[in-house]
């Protein structure tokens, strides 16, 4: 949401105020939305590598139980890509940098999401 809002020219205040009345408003948005908007990935609440590890274990447990979690597996892969891009020791919200990197490399916003 933040990536799209910034691309559309919305201010942080307008985006966060608008998000409050939608399903996008969550603990994470309330506590980290402003950090993502400002691209302030330090200080951290938890490292991206730790979030990736937790997602990896979660997907493995689901697979062992015969449960399909394709969205969770996709997130795990995004966190792995962010770690491999060098963001592993930053705040877990730095996964957002994949979108910024793709845009700076001339990719469309959809490409890093596939």
Predicted regions and their residues:
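Small-residue-rich helix-loop
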Residues: 10-23
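Interdomain hinge/lid region at the active-site interface
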Residues: 8, 27-92
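Helix-loop "lid/cap" segments that line or gate small-molecule binding pockets
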Residues: 4-5, 61-62, 98
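NAD(P)-dependent dehydrogenase/reductase Rossmann-like domain
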Residues: 80, 84-114
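Short secondary-structure capping/turn micro-motifs that flank functional sites
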Residues: 21-22, 35, 78-79, 98-99
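Amphipathic alpha-helical interaction segments
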Residues: 14-17, 73-77, 94-97
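Conserved anion/nucleotide-ligand pocket segment
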Residues: 2-11
